[in-house]
């Protein structure tokens, strides 16, 4: 009898969850280190304030946050070797992929990315090969429902926003130009909106439409492989398929 099998499965599941959580903590710690180069005081450093907010939302312990700030600002070790690098490539069905990384070794990161692409039906490309298919913009998530839409529209007329999207979870995502993130989230707060998250994102200008389940699975497998790499900060793609296909492919 395999009476221990359930416990073994629980332990394996916990190990996977712990590993993923550790990877998230490491990734967010690196973001804090890079942001802290411009000053260790969050009140005068918007990028650091943003990184700390993301870390707290993910449950990163306060001690980890403090150590990352110290390293990045040169007070506790060397965090200055980390640099922000962008990589571009193609996936199955011509999907464009844009990856942001924080790394202390460009050669290692490029090799890891090249392997992940090649093992999953893609190719790491040259700088600029797909960036023109995306736009970099600000995004602020607020608490809002369909009942708040008229008020939200009035608010956005007074702010430097260029659109919004109401979501089914009781939130709305407000979009704006890349350079306006701080002013946009400050303005929404001042108008009484509860701001949940804010940051920059890459949005696809055109999409690759996927209708085949096998192709969708290949695309998602590549994106998951890239996102799982230690140095990767974000993975963006111009992939589009309907919700039913996404559920089948996941």
From Swiss-Prot:
The keyword Calcium does not apply. GO terms for biological process: regulation of DNA-templated transcription. It comes from the Bacteria. GO terms for molecular function: DNA binding. Keywords: Cytoplasm, DNA-binding, Transcription, Transcription regulation. One of its GO terms (cellular component) is cytosol. InterPro entries: Integrase-like_N, TACO1_YebC-like_2nd/3rd_dom, TACO1_YebC_N, Transcrip_reg_TACO1-like, Transcrip_reg_TACO1-like_dom3, YebC-like. It is found in: Cytoplasm. NCBIfam families: PRK00110.1 (NF001030), PRK12378.1 (NF009044), YebC/PmpR family DNA-binding transcriptional regulator (TIGR01033). Belongs to the TACO1 family. This is Probable transcriptional regulatory protein SYNW0543. It comes from Parasynechococcus marenigrum (strain WH8102).
């Amino acid at each position: 009898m395999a009476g221990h099998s359930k416990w073994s499965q629980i332990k394996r599941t916990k190990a996977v969850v712990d590993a993923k959580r550790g990877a998230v903590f490491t990734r967010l710690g690196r973001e804090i280190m890079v942001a802290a180069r411009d000053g260790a005081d969050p009140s005068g450093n918007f990028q650091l304030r943003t990184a700390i907010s993301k870390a707290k939302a993910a449950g990163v312990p306060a001690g980890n946050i403090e150590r990352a700030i110290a390293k990045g600002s040169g007070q506790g070790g060397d965090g200055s070797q980390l640099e922000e690098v962008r990589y571009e490539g193609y996936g199955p069905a011509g999907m464009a992929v844009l990856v942001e990384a924080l790394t202390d070794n460009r050669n290692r990161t490029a090799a890891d990315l090249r392997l992940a692409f090649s093992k999953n039906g893609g190719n790491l490309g040259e700088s600029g090969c797909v960036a023109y298919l995306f736009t970099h913009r600000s995004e602020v998530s607020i608490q809002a429902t369909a009942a708040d839409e008229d008020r939200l529209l009035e608010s956005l007329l007074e702010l430097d926003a260029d659109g919004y999207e109401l979501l089914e979870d009781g939130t709305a995502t407000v979009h704006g130009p890349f350079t306006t993130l701080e002013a946009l989230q400050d303005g929404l707060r001042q108008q009484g909106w509860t701001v949940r998250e804010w940051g920059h994102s890459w949005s696809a200008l055109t999409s690759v439409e996927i209708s085949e389940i096998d192709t969708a699975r290949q695309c998602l497998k590549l994106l998951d492989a890239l996102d799982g790499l230690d140095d990767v900060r974000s993975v963006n793609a111009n992939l589009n398929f309907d919700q039913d296909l996404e559920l089948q492919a996941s």
